[in-house]
UniProtKB/Swiss-Prot annotation:
WD repeat start and end residues: 347-375, 387-415, 427-455, 466-496, 508-543, 553-595, 607-635, 647-675
Originating species: Emericella nidulans (strain FGSC A4 / ATCC 38163 / CBS 112.46 / NRRL 194 / M139)
Compositional bias ranges of the Basic and acidic residues kind: 35-49
Record's GO cellular component terms: nuclear SCF ubiquitin ligase complex; nucleus
Family under the similarity heading: Belongs to the WD repeat MET30/SCONB/SCON-2 family.
SMART domains according to UniProt: FBOX (SM00256), WD40 (SM00320)
Gene this protein is translated from: sconB
Alphabetically ordered keywords of this record: Repeat, Transcription, Transcription regulation, Ubl conjugation pathway, WD repeat
Keyword Repeat: yes
UniProt protein name: Probable E3 ubiquitin ligase complex SCF subunit sconB
């Protein structure tokens, strides 16, 4: 057979297959076939082909379409008026299941209303015969089961040209997108949203009202606050400060007022301005669980007869967690980029050696022998405490009292609200240059090289001896009943108050150690980032096991047994261990981060040009002040200096650190407060 004969044979075979496919397609959709004695229109009249079934008589459509509809959707189509009976498999089907996982289910995807309106308008614009033909096609496809639908679609797409296939591809791309957040149960939707960052959550809340309700829910933002507030997020590296304690106190007082002192003449809670004008209440300091006091429900409301519990007064007032995060995020961003306002306090006539601030109260001590109390909001000097005969080197206050230490060898307790000196303690043989109290325990460090412990409950006192030079700073940790001390002998010591012995000595500084600050227990440090420099330079007391036992046994850092092994037998399972991390500063111009359980120096911070006198730290940052008149902000995990502040004309001698502020005192007689509030 010649090449031309083969070619002609292939063409005839292709035409035969095409005609057979076309006849099958027309038969499926009710169009006339060649078997009915009608010729096929030429290709130039393809439009007439599309609606050839429009010329079919109503009897033909009824014979082909009606039985198909009655067989597959009897509950919707019963042309003979017979009672529709659902098949057993369909009547028992659970429509709550996705049809993809239940083959006996039909797709119940809801049609898009705007799209259907558009289709309806286009359909109505066609002639009556064309409308009937298209409706028949739609009805057949709608009634067909899944297997038949696929066959119908395959037949349609087999006859589509490339522009039509391109249209299908573009249309399907949008149709297969589903609103999974709205379709899923809320619990699963919350789980998904909890994986998003803040930017993605804010974008998700703009999708629709349904998405906004879920993306703004407290479940999602409470999780976000847990990951970032008062700690560094392991995923994004961001950490945000705690809630403003003043705002927490005001919210707590408002709840207490509504719960206990309500009367019928009160129409609402106290205004924030009224709360802000009142001085601190003198109650105990806020505990950690009070961070979320604004979210608590007030359940102890009055039950007097005739009281309308549905009134606005009795409605629980919540502060959304998203608002909490937003507030803290602004402050955290200001910290990161150094955006702050500065307020200067002038009044001392000699160098400022110590300070502390809480809410709107600032206390400063100076070599001019006075203590001054300031209002941080107005900058006004409220009162001056006089009584010491020499320079004041250290102080600390709470809601009810202020304790100060002076070079005149005395410790004084003041009522800082009235300026009255309540009592004076003597016991040191040299000037008192460091003190710290927690609960009923007061520790003081002195020029006489000792640490003295004062117990306000049983009125007992004792001394801790071991340093060979001035003790510059002390810190009490009542939960573990231990004390940290820093000295001019270039060491830091950890003392056990129960045994009155030194349980660890930290060596590493080559200059006089001026400050020691235990870090909060929430602080976490990645061990692989440690710059272990002097593992063998720290020593322990005779009854303590070697520092490396914790690592060698593979125990968790905060496990009770490992802590007991690290600090000695006196730390049994029921006794808390000291804070795991601490930071120190010295006149060797460095700051060091230590692990107390092993005695290792994990990181050394370099950057100051002269000795570091002042130090403050929390879970997010370290703030230091030095002889070089500079203040530096450090990331304790990376060791990076994030920001440097200047402005003092003398050495920076003291620092107070808060969540959104820090204050510095200098030998230039000034105090500067840096506020990062938005």
């Amino acid at each position: 057979m010649s090449t031309e004969d083969n070619h002609d044979s292939q063409i005839l075979t292709a035409r035969h297959r095409s005609d057979a496919s076309e006849q099958s397609f027309k038969s499926l959709f009710g169009g006339p076939s060649s078997e009915d004695g009608k010729e096929t229109e030429p290709d130039t009249h393809d439009h007439n082909h599309s609606f050839s079934n429009a010329k079919a008589p109503a009897k033909f459509a009824n014979q082909n379409v009606a039985p198909f509809l009655a067989r597959h959707i009897p509950e919707q189509y019963a042309p003979l008026g017979a009672q529709s009976i659902l098949p057993a498999d369909l009547s028992s089907a659970n429509s709550k299941y996705c049809y993809r996982h239940r083959p006996d289910q039909k797709c119940r995807r809801q049609a898009d209303e705007p799209s259907m309106d558009k289709l309806q308008r286009e359909l109505e614009s066609l002639p009556q015969g064309d409308q009937q033909s298209i409706s028949h096609v739609w009805s057949l496809f709608s009634a067909a089961p899944a297997k038949h639908r696929k066959l119908i679609l395959q037949g349609i797409m087999a006859q589509c040209c490339f522009p039509q296939l391109s249209y299908i591809s573009a249309t399907v791309r949008d149709l297969i997108r589903i609103d999974f957040i709205t379709a899923l149960p809320p619990e699963i939707a919350f789980k998904i949203l909890c994986y998003l960052d803040t930017t993605s959550l804010c974008k998700a809340s703009q999708v629709s009202r349904g998405w906004r309700a879920l993306a703004d829910d407290d479940v999602v933002w409470h999780r976000m606050c847990e990951q970032h507030i008062h700690r560094k997020c392991k995923k994004c590296g961001w950490g945000l400060p705690l809630l403003d304690r003043k705002r927490l106190r005001e919210s707590k007082r408002e709840i207490e007022l509504r719960a206990t002192t309500w009367d019928k003449g009160v129409v609402g809670p106290r205004s924030p301005d009224a709360s802000a004008e009142s001085p601190p209440s003198g109650k105990r300091k806020l505990e950690d669980d009070e961070v979320a006091v604004v979210k608590r429900h007030c359940s102890s409301l009055g039950s007097d007869a005739g009281v309308d519990k549905d009134s606005d007064f009795f409605k629980t007032r919540y502060r959304p967690w998203k608002e909490v995060y937003k507030d803290r995020f602004k402050v955290g961003t200001n910290w990161k980029y150094g955006r702050c306002s500065i307020k200067t306090f002038k009044g001392h006539t000699n160098g400022v050696m110590c300070l502390q601030f809480e809410d709107n109260i600032l206390a400063t001590g100076s070599y001019d022998t006075t203590i001054k109390i300031w209002d941080t909001e107005t900058g006004e000097e409220l009162r001056t405490l006089r009584g010491h005969e020499s320079g004041i080197r250290c102080l600390q206050f709470d809601d009810t009292k202020l304790i100060s230490g002076s070079m005149d060898r005395t410790i004084k307790v003041w009522n800082w609200r009235t300026g009255e000196c309540i009592s004076t303690y003597t016991g040191h043989r040299g000037g008192v240059i460091g003190l710290h109290f927690d609960a009923s325990i007061l520790a003081s460090g002195s020029v006489d090289k000792t640490v003295k412990i004062w117990n306000f409950e049983d009125k007992s006192t004792f001394s801790l001896r071991g340093h060979t030079d001035w003790v510059n700073a002390v810190r009490v940790d009542t939960s573990s009943r231990t004390v940290f001390s820093a000295s001019d002998d270039c060491t830091v010591r950890l003392w056990d108050l129960d045994t009155k012995t030194c349980i660890r000595t930290f060596h590493g500084h080559v200059g006089q150690v001026q400050q020691v600050v235990p870090l909060p227990r929430e602080f976490e440090f990645e061990e692989h980032d440690a710059e272990c420099e002097n593992d063998d330079l720290s020593t322990t007391s005779g009854d303590a096991d070697p520092p490396s036992i914790q690592a060698s046994m593979g125990l968790e850092p905060n496990a009770a047994y490992s802590q007991s092994s690290a600090f000695g037998t006196s730390f049994d399972n029921g006794r808390a261990a000291p804070p795991r991390y601490m930071v120190t500063s010295a006149l060797d111009s460095t700051i060091r981060l230590w692990e107390t359980t092993t005695g290792r120096c994990l990181r050394t911070f370099f950057g100051h040009l002269e000795g570091v006198w002042a130090l403050g730290a929390d879970t997010l940052r370290i703030v230091s002040g030095a002889e070089d008149r500079m203040i530096k902000i450090w990331d304790p995990r990376t060791g990076k200096c994030e920001r440097t502040f200047t402005g003092h004309s003398g050495p920076v001698t003291c620092i107070g650190l808060g969540d959104s502020r820090f204050a510095t005192g200098s030998e230039d007689c000034e105090v500067r407060m840096y506020s990062f509030q938005s």
